């Protein structure tokens, strides 16, 4: 309203876990801590295996390493703060720290989506154009693709963060979430620009994510068409099995994201919001290295060769 005085907010209060029973918080802390450590260990194990095993020095595993790095950084940007809030009652976060957390969560989230899209393209070239693979997926070209995914994630993250934090925040400084979640933060904004910024943020996010999903689906349409032309059932199964881990992670990534951003308005409470948000911020990065290492026979054998047999001789 014209002439209304807005107080300057220098910090926010994260109240995402305030609705949980106090006796449940230590259990959640231990669970999320173990998942956080396993996420770091699993992704570092994948990266170390690819680094050591020379036959894994291919575009597919370069993209997988880039994905592991983005998952590690995404997890580090969110989970330590969440673990601290589970232990301590003082859950404030400064205005600047909130903006930084939002930027990194969006940056690595967008980068993750872009990398999944590039990995889909890699599978498409491998199966549909095997004779031209070395030309289309040259080391220099793959390095450029990885660089563009990170640059794109950085630009998109900066764009969304600047749009949100150029708004005026008034009234309550309590964010009903365990992190600086964009939708929860926008509810605290006021002024004439708020509605247009909300539309802008949604447009940027939906355009980027749906665009990536569309290109992934398009890649798999061509992949399935090529697989169906393989005469033997064994050949079809072997070819499709190379894509299963990537397809599983894509489905998981977009399914959990939909739980957060596309859930019906009627299903809304701090308790349910926090639980659903952890599926994307904690559970997805936790499952990704498991899926890639278990569903990828070549990677699983390399891990067993370089680590399991070396450090666990009894298991061999």
Curated annotation (Swiss-Prot):
<feature type="transmembrane region" description="Helical; Name=7">
    <location>
        <begin position="273"/>
        <end position="293"/>
    </location>
</feature>
<dbReference type="GO" id="GO:0004984">
    <property type="term" value="F:olfactory receptor activity"/>
</dbReference>
<keyword id="KW-1015">Disulfide bond</keyword>
<dbReference type="InterPro" id="IPR000725">
    <property type="entry name" value="Olfact_rcpt"/>
</dbReference>
<keyword id="KW-1003">Cell membrane</keyword>
<dbReference type="Pfam" id="PF13853">
    <property type="entry name" value="7tm_4"/>
</dbReference>
<keyword id="KW-0297">G-protein coupled receptor</keyword>
<feature type="transmembrane region" description="Helical; Name=2">
    <location>
        <begin position="55"/>
        <end position="75"/>
    </location>
</feature>
<feature type="topological domain" description="Extracellular">
    <location>
        <begin position="260"/>
        <end position="272"/>
    </location>
</feature>
<feature type="transmembrane region" description="Helical; Name=3">
    <location>
        <begin position="100"/>
        <end position="120"/>
    </location>
</feature>
<feature type="topological domain" description="Extracellular">
    <location>
        <begin position="1"/>
        <end position="25"/>
    </location>
</feature>
<feature type="disulfide bond">
    <location>
        <begin position="98"/>
        <end position="190"/>
    </location>
</feature>
<keyword id="KW-0675">Receptor</keyword>
<dbReference type="GO" id="GO:0004930">
    <property type="term" value="F:G protein-coupled receptor activity"/>
</dbReference>
<feature type="topological domain" description="Cytoplasmic">
    <location>
        <begin position="294"/>
        <end position="316"/>
    </location>
</feature>
<protein>
    <recommendedName>
        <fullName>Olfactory receptor 10H3</fullName>
    </recommendedName>
</protein>
<feature type="topological domain" description="Extracellular">
    <location>
        <begin position="76"/>
        <end position="99"/>
    </location>
</feature>
<dbReference type="GO" id="GO:0005886">
    <property type="term" value="C:plasma membrane"/>
</dbReference>
<dbReference type="InterPro" id="IPR000276">
    <property type="entry name" value="GPCR_Rhodpsn"/>
</dbReference>
<keyword id="KW-0807">Transducer</keyword>
<keyword id="KW-1133">Transmembrane helix</keyword>
<keyword id="KW-0472">Membrane</keyword>
<feature type="topological domain" description="Extracellular">
    <location>
        <begin position="161"/>
        <end position="197"/>
    </location>
</feature>
<feature type="topological domain" description="Cytoplasmic">
    <location>
        <begin position="121"/>
        <end position="139"/>
    </location>
</feature>
<dbReference type="GO" id="GO:0050911">
    <property type="term" value="P:detection of chemical stimulus involved in sensory perception of smell"/>
</dbReference>
<feature type="topological domain" description="Cytoplasmic">
    <location>
        <begin position="47"/>
        <end position="54"/>
    </location>
</feature>
<keyword id="KW-0812">Transmembrane</keyword>
<feature type="topological domain" description="Cytoplasmic">
    <location>
        <begin position="219"/>
        <end position="238"/>
    </location>
</feature>
<keyword id="KW-0716">Sensory transduction</keyword>
<keyword id="KW-0552">Olfaction</keyword>
<comment type="function">
    <text>Odorant receptor.</text>
</comment>
<feature type="transmembrane region" description="Helical; Name=6">
    <location>
        <begin position="239"/>
        <end position="259"/>
    </location>
</feature>
<dbReference type="InterPro" id="IPR017452">
    <property type="entry name" value="GPCR_Rhodpsn_7TM"/>
</dbReference>
<feature type="transmembrane region" description="Helical; Name=4">
    <location>
        <begin position="140"/>
        <end position="160"/>
    </location>
</feature>
<feature type="transmembrane region" description="Helical; Name=5">
    <location>
        <begin position="198"/>
        <end position="218"/>
    </location>
</feature>
<feature type="transmembrane region" description="Helical; Name=1">
    <location>
        <begin position="26"/>
        <end position="46"/>
    </location>
</feature>
<comment type="similarity">
    <text>Belongs to the G-protein coupled receptor 1 family.</text>
</comment>
């Amino acid at each position: 309203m014209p002439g209304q005085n807005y107080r300057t907010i220098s910090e926010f209060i994260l109240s995402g876990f305030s609705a949980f029973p106090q006796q449940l918080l230590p259990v959640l802390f231990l669970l999320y801590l173990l998942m956080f450590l396993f996420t770091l260990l699993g992704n570092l194990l994948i990266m170390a295996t690819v680094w050591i095993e020379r036959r894994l020095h291919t575009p597919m595993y370069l993209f997988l390493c880039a994905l592991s790095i983005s998952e590690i950084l995404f997890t580090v940007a969110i989970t330590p703060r969440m673990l601290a809030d589970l232990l301590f009652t003082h859950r404030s976060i400064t205005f600047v720290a909130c903006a930084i957390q939002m930027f990194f969560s969006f940056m690595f989230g967008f980068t993750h989506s872009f990398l999944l899209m590039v990995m889909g393209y890699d599978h498409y070239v491998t199966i549909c154009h095997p004779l031209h693979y070395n030309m289309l997926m040259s080391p220099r070209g793959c390095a450029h693709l990885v660089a563009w995914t990170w640059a794109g994630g950085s630009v998109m993250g900066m764009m969304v963060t600047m749009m949100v934090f150029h708004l005026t925040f008034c009234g309550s400084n309590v964010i009903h979430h365990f992190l600086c979640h964009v939708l929860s933060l926008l509810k605290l904004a006021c002024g004439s620009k708020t509605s247009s910024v909300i539309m802008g943020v949604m447009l940027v996010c939906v355009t980027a994510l749906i665009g990536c999903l569309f290109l992934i689906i398009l890649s798999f349409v061509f992949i399935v068409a090529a697989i169906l032309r393989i005469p033997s059932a064994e050949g079809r199964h072997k070819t499709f099995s190379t894509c299963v881990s990537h397809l599983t992670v894509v489905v998981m990534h977009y399914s959990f994201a939909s739980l957060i951003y596309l859930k019906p308005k009627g299903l809304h409470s701090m308790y349910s919001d926090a639980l659903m948000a952890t599926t994307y911020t904690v559970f997805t990065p936790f499952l990704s290295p498991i899926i890639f290492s278990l569903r990828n026979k070549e990677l699983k054998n390399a891990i067993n060769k370089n680590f399991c047999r070396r450090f666990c001789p009894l298991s061999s």
